[in-house]
A protein has these predicted regions:
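Short, solvent-exposed coil/turn elements at secondary-structure transition points
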Residues: 43, 63-65, 79, 127, ...
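Flexible, gly/pro- and Lys/Arg-enriched active-site loops
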Residues: 115-152
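Conserved histidine-centered catalytic loops in small-molecule metabolism enzymes
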Residues: 140-171
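Active-site lining segments that contact anionic ligands and/or coordinate catalytic metals
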Residues: 35, 97-99, 118-120, 163-165
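Active-site ligand-binding patch in enzyme domains
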Residues: 1-99, 107-110
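Small/polar glycine-rich anion-binding or flexible loop at a beta-alpha turn
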Residues: 105-111, 128-129
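Alpha-helix boundary recognition
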Residues: 3-4, 53, 93, 113-114, ...
């Protein structure tokens, strides 16, 4: 599975508050280590009852660090009200993390794309259109012109159930 191929799985606080994800590998035959669960939470709003607060988790904040359940909370430099993503990756690298799956949400994905920190993307697309009522998978990138948009090369594509899965590599 996708999660099992990474050292860490990252989400933003919006995903934690909306979905309370476990961020674990749930394959029946998986007996390897679980990826480190990483949350970007600049204002420390992660509930003590959240699944990510139960351990094997790192919560990055720009606020004064305080305990949240069994999760480790790390204070990093502020970048416009959010955790500095380079500082986050430096901490993860120092802990042996070499591969991070950014699983959600759109603001986190946009931040990593804006900072040119994405090597590869994998995503599923359903054959439905939601328009502006839907959730965006990538928030605003604040591009001055189309030429500034991050560019990717399609490496793989496959129909999975009724959805389309793609793997893209940064050019």
């Amino acid at each position: 599975g996708l999660r099992a191929r990474h050292d860490a799985i990252m989400v933003g606080i919006g995903t934690v508050l909306a979905d309370d994800p476990a961020l674990t590998v749930r394959l029946p035959d998986h007996n390897g280590p679980q990826p480190l669960r990483v949350v970007l939470d600049s204002r420390l709003r992660t509930p003590e009852t959240a699944q990510v607060a139960s351990g094997n988790s790192l919560i990055f904040t720009t606020a004064s660090a305080r305990p949240i359940g069994k999760a480790e909370v790390v204070e990093v430099v502020d970048a416009d009200g959010r955790a500095n993503l380079h500082a986050v990756l430096d901490v993860l690298y120092a802990r042996g993390v070499r591969s991070v799956l950014i699983e959600g949400g759109g603001e986190v994905a946009a931040g990593f794309l804006r900072e040119n920190l994405v090597d590869q993307m994998e995503w599923f697309r359903a054959p439905i259109l939601l328009g502006s009522e839907g959730r965006t998978c990538v928030a605003a990138l604040s591009l001055a012109k189309l030429a500034d948009a991050p560019k990717f090369r399609r490496k793989a594509i496959q129909v999975v159930g009724g959805d389309l899965w793609e793997r893209l590599e940064r050019i």
